[in-house]
Every structure is written in C-alpha cells, then in structure tokens.
C-alpha cells in the first residue's frame, strides 16, 4: 500500500447566495479557479501527471451538471487525458472526494489526483431546480424527505438544546470568523476570483463592475445576541431554528492535490498533511444532524486514536442545534471546535464544504502545534461523515 499525502489544499472565498459576489459566476468556472489555485501551489508537478479529477457536488444539475468535474477540468486547462468524475454524498461530498482520491492512490490506482468540491446555491438551490420525490417513500417513509430545518428542530428537542444556546453558539461563530479574517488566517488558503457583477454608478446607471473576490462574505461584526433573539423561527411556528442560528446558503469551490508520497518526494513537494481515516455512518433521517455521533467513533477506531488526541475539530455548523447536540453527546471539548468560526458565519456551500474545511484545518493545525485534526459533518438523508488529518 502506498503512503499518500495532501500536497496542496485551497478554496475560494465563500459568497452569499443568491445575491452575493459569486451570484453570476458559473460553478464550473468557479471550480476551475480552485483547481488552478491548488496546482499553482505545486509548481514542480507537471499537469500531464494528473490522472483524475474528483469533485463533490450536492446538487449536480443545470450549470453544475453534465459531470461538472469534467467541465471544470477543461476550464482549468487540464489535458484531455486527465479523466474526471463528479460524486455526491450531499454535505460531505468535498471530504468524500479527497477520501476517494487517497484510497485510489493508496491502492496503486493512480499517483496524482485533484479532489475537491463545488456548489453554487445561487444557480442551483437546495433540493435542485425540479425535485422529484419517490412516491413510495413519500407514502411509507415520509421522514426520509423531512426538511433539514425540521430535522434540526427534532434534534434540539430530543437533546434539550435551547434557543438561547443556539443563538449564543451562532454569535460565537460570527465573532470567531470576524477575528480570523481580521488576523488574516484565511488569506493563504483563499484563491482570489475575479468577478464581474452589475452595479449602479453615481449617476444611477447600471454598469458592469469588476472586482477581486477574496474575503468570505458571511461573517457579521455587527450581530448581537439581542439581534439574533429577535429573529423568528423559519421551519416551525413554535420552533427555535432561525436564519441566524442556521448555516448560510453559499457559493464556493475548493480543491486539493493528492499524491503518492513517493512521487511527491521525487519532485521535492512537501506534504501539508495526510488523511489517515475516513468513515461514514447512517442514522435516522428525521434527526439527520446527529450523524457525526456515529461517524466519528468509526473514524477514530480506524486511526487508532481516542477523541482526546484530536487537537482541533472542524464540525460543520449546518445548524447550531445539531452542532451543539454532537458536541454534547460525544463529549467534545468546545474549545477545540471551529476555532475560526463555522458555517453559520462562514457559509456552507454544500458539496464544497468538506474540501473547504480540509484546507482550513491543514493550516490551523501547524499554527497551534496540533498533530491530529478532524473534519466532520452531518449529511442529508440521515448520515454522518468524519475524516482525521495528520500533520508533521
């Protein structure tokens, strides 16, 4: 079995959907920027050596359909000999793509693969443009199609999570993200993207305005506990889940260069880190958000580690309710979780998120002298995923 490294991992800044800076940027074009951004970090690597591109996408249709990974590989200028595939495990798709690349290289099926994810919720909304539910499931197992927000309400009720706890968690997400941006902690991982959007000039005329998008749009320095408390529940009249304590609709892309350690050494390419374990698990879809509770122990067992050996954790904040429940049930030290903010502030571009969090974690771990880190998230349909990273 081959030793496998992650040689580079980058992401775009995350735009707010559907009215943010990336609202007119096609997802296949956006993914190409991420792919090229990752490859620019490993200049020793000739593009002819890239054997495959694997991109995760949660809603692979319309502008992110037609095998968006293949389209993005063409837009990135990769050789036609480099194949590509799009994979979908909803919110864990970006992490899944990296895990698949690692497994493929470990087994000798390739030496160099670009893996990542892309999602434009501006172009393709949650659920897609034309949802078509299975009639049998609608009749016999309607919980399998329960909206994500209602699953969060159920998790909150089941695990005794209060509205106050959820709003406080959301506030901290914004505070940490704002501080991280001010400190420049995301600058190295972000690939600047040139965007052109309509804007009104001083005379009231609408003209095309060009800019370089390189700072996450979501974090709000002006939010407060009082402001969050005023928001009404979105999914249930008597519920607790609001727009303020849920992840944002987002646009973004991320990519990683995954290589055999042997080939990287030959080219003089250092390792950013290694994905040493990846696990998934199913759970009741009506409590989808609790998925990491079942995936994390499996990943830890695979890695031969205990939870207290994990120094940093990127736990995707689909909803404050489910993130708090996962922390509570697993007994995670909250001080290790989302130290630079999470999806409530920074956004959640579905199929991109797992690769995005990997890029962030691989940079924060060396800063804090952490050897082992974890990326984990709940997954629509009742699942959880977890990956363990090692640096040094």
Q: Can you say where each PLM-predicted feature lies in the sequence?
A:
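Condensing-enzyme catalytic core mediating Claisen C-C bond formation in acyl metabolism
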Residues: 1-27, 224-290, 294, 301, ...
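Acidic, glycine-rich active-site loops and adjacent beta-strand->loop/helix elements
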Residues: 10-13, 56-60, 89-93, 117-122, ...
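N-terminal extracellular/periplasmic Venus flytrap/periplasmic-binding protein-like
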Residues: 10-13, 24, 28-33, 44, ...
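Conserved beta-ketoacyl condensing-enzyme motif
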Residues: 22-112, 118-135, 190-214, 286-287, ...
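Conserved catalytic cysteine-centered active-site region
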Residues: 25, 57-111, 131, 142-153, ...
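Short, well-ordered amphipathic alpha-helical segments that serve as non-catalytic structural scaffolds
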Residues: 27-43, 68-72, 97, 148-155, ...
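Active-site-proximal alpha-helical scaffold in enzymes
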Residues: 87-118, 156-186, 255-262, 327, ...
């Amino acid at each position: 079995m081959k030793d496998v490294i992650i040689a580079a991992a980058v992401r775009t800044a995350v735009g707010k959907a559907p009215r943010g800076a990336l609202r007119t940027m096609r997802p296949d074009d956006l993914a190409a920027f991420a792919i090229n951004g990752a490859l620019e970090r490993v200049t020793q690597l000739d593009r002819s050596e890239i054997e495959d591109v694997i991109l995760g996408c949660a809603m692979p249709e319309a502008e992110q359909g037609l095998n968006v990974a293949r389209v993005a590989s063409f837009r990135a200028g990769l050789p036609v000999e480099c194949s590509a595939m799009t994979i979908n495990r909803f919110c864990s798709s970006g992490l899944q793509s990296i895990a698949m690349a690692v497994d493929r290289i470990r087994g000798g099926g390739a030496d160099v693969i670009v893996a990542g994810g892309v999602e434009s919720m501006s172009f393709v909304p949650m659920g897609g443009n034309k949802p078509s539910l299975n009639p049998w499931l609608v009749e016999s197992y309607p919980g399998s199609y329960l909206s994500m927000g209602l699953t969060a309400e159920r998790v909150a009720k089941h695990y005794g999570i209060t509205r106050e706890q959820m709003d406080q968690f959301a506030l901290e997400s914004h505070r940490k993200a704002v501080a991280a941006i001010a400190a420049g902690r995301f600058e190295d991982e972000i690939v600047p993207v040139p965007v052109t959007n309509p804007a009104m000039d001083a005379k009231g005329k609408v003209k095309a305005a060009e800019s370089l998008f390189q700072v996450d749009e979501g974090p709000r320095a002006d939010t407060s506990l009082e402001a969050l408390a005023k928001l009404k529940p979105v999914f249930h009249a008597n519920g607790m889940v609001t727009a303020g304590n849920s992840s944002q609709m987002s646009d973004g892309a991320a990519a990683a260069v995954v290589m055999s350690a042997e080939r990287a050494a030959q080219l003089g390419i250092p390792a950013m880190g290694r994905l040493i374990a990846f696990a998934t698990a199913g759970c009741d879809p009506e409590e989808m958000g609790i998925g990491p509770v079942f995936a994390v122990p499996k990943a830890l067992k695979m890695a031969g580690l205990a939870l207290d050996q994990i120094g940093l954790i990127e736990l995707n904040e689909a909803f404050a309710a489910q993130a708090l429940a996962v922390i509570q049930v697993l007994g995670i030290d909250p001080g290790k979780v989302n130290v630079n903010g999470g999806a409530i502030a920074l956004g959640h571009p579905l199929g991109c998120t797992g690769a995005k969090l990997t890029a962030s974690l691989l940079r924060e771990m060396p800063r804090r002298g952490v050897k082992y880190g974890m990326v984990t998230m709940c997954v629509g349909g009742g699942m959880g995923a977890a990956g363990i990273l090692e640096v040094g």
